[in-house]
């Protein structure tokens, strides 16, 4: 009985150590989430600056506008990839926590069964000792999950706005290209008409000049 009780206590201690390791991983995820939030804020500021620059975009070369759109697309893809990786890490961490919780409950049950005929205070002390630690870990995980969900919601909202802005810019760019093509065609047509008129008037001007000289 004593051997079994010691084994159960050792297993419980091992589970607590694993919980501490996962708690460290949770803190790392929280730091990454905080960093992502800062990047989202930086992206928001960047978009505000882009909005100001778009007001004078028509006075700049088309290549500058295209480069700005390409840079914005690249940043959006990077944020989407980082958001996806953080979301995957959160799911993996929660799955690991659920597995550890299941193992912990199993160990506590075995301890209860092994200590059924022993002093009940041992069971009570062990349960109180680990319940507090487990509750602290659960609260940290819930806090991390809340922060992650908020970051994901903010990120998705910003991405939707960015996609709409990009579509508007692409539509405007297409319209500018079309207007540029029309202007070029009109210029070439007028140039061709001027050349034709000059050619047809040349003999008439020459004849008139000769008549005036004879007079």
Swiss-Prot record:
Residues 35-183 form a coiled coil. Keywords: Coiled coil, Cytoplasm. The keyword Kinase does not apply. InterPro entries: SIKE. It comes from the Eukaryota. GO terms for cellular component: cytoplasm. Disulfide bonds: none annotated. GO terms for biological process: response to wounding. It is found in: Cytoplasm. Belongs to the SIKE family. This is FGFR1 oncogene partner 2 homolog. It comes from Danio rerio.
